[in-house]
């Protein structure tokens, strides 16, 4: 069996680490269209909203995710990703991603099923089994109530309501704060900051329709960089079969 080049393996690993770690985002165009309003709630309201969002996120077992990256984020090869993930009864994910393989940008499709990551990276239309995903990255971390998005919401520091916005077409309350760099590293599968950085500026957009769903989260690991994840279709059940 011919093994894929190391650069392709590394990029495929990046798919796995990001698709279910940070995954999904609205574009900058969406952010540009969002109209800020004066903050209508106190910082106490921010804590309450984050608590409600945390509780809601802990109950999510599947969703659609979109990821977008601005700037050169350390240790992050994926620049764009869109896919679906669910963790009940087992972790399954499908989607597509754009990655840096060496100095070249490549598009790839991926399927994660039965504990294996399959991708056509480097061979469009022909899938390669990149092995047991659990040995590369714990793909269930995104929806893990103790390590994933729920954990970030529960531990967002210096939280403050920054107004109301439309995020991905959903009415939301925008909250700014800071996340632990270690928590971000756990979620991303690799450290996105230097070792001496302790916190990462984080902004979240929480649905104001009563569901308290986390619609969007954006982190700024380093100067002039950002990673934005947008969620939808909460509760979605994802199915997939091993690619032929």
Swiss-Prot record:
Protein name in the entry: Lipoprotein LprA
Lipid sites, type S-diacylglycerol cysteine: 25
Gene name in the database record: lprA
SUPFAM superfamilies the UniProt entry points to: Prokaryotic lipoproteins and lipoprotein localization factors (SSF89392)
Organism this protein belongs to: Mycobacterium tuberculosis (strain ATCC 25618 / H37Rv)
Function: Constitutes a host TLR2 agonist (toll-like receptor), shown experimentally for human and mouse. In host cells full-length (acylated) protein acts as a TLR2 agonist, inducing human and murine macrophages to produce cytokines, inducing murine dendritic cell maturation and cytokine production and inhibiting antibody processing in murine macrophages. Binds diacylated phosphatidyl-myo-inositol mannosides (PIMs). Does not induce murine macrophage apoptosis or necrosis. Non-acylated protein does not act as a TLR2 agonist.
One CC-aspect GO term: plasma membrane
Entry PTM: Modified by Lgt on Cys-25 with an S-linked diacylglycerol, signal peptide is removed by LspA, Cys-25 is further modifed with an amide group on the amino group by Lnt yielding a triacylated protein. Upon expression in M.smegmatis non-glycosylated form and glycosylated forms are detected (by concanavalin A binding); when only the mature sequence is expressed from mutated protein only the non-glycosylated form is detected.
Subcellular location: Cell membrane
Outcome of mutating residue 25 to M: When expressed from this site no longer acts as a TLR2 agonist, suggests active protein is acylated. No glycosylated form detected
Protein family per UniProt: Belongs to the LppX/LprAFG lipoprotein family.
Membrane topology summary: Lipid-anchor
Signal peptide: 1-24
Keywords: Cell membrane, Glycoprotein, Lipid-binding, Lipoprotein, Membrane, Palmitate, Signal
């Amino acid at each position: 069996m011919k093994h894929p080049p190391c650069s392709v393996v590394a990029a495929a690993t990046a798919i796995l680490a990001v698709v279910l770690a940070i995954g999904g985002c609205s574009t900058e165009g969406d952010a540009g269209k969002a109209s800020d309003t004066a903050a209508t709630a106190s910082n106490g309201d921010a804590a309450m909203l984050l608590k409600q969002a945390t509780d809601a996120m802990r109950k999510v077992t599947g969703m659609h995710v979109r990821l977008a990256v601005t700037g050169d984020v350390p240790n992050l090869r994926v620049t764009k990703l869109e896919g679906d993930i669910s963790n009940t009864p087992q972790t399954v994910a499908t989607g597509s991603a754009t990655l840096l393989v060496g100095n070249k940008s490549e598009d790839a499709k991926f399927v994660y099923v039965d504990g294996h990551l399959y991708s056509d990276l480097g061979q469009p239309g022909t899938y390669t089994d990149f092995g047991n995903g659990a040995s590369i990255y714990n793909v269930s971390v995104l929806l893990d109530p103790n390590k994933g998005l729920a954990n970030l919401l529960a531990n967002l520091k210096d939280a403050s309501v920054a107004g109301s916005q439309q995020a991905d077409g959903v009415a939301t309350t925008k909250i700014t704060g800071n996340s632990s760099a270690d928590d971000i590293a756990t979620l991303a599968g690799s450290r996105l900051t230097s070792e001496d950085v302790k916190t990462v500026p984080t902004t979240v957009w929480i649905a104001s329709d009563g569901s308290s769903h986390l619609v969007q989260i954006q982190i700024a690991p380093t100067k002039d960089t950002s990673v934005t994840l947008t969620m939808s279709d909460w509760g979605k059940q994802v199915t997939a079969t091993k690619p032929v």
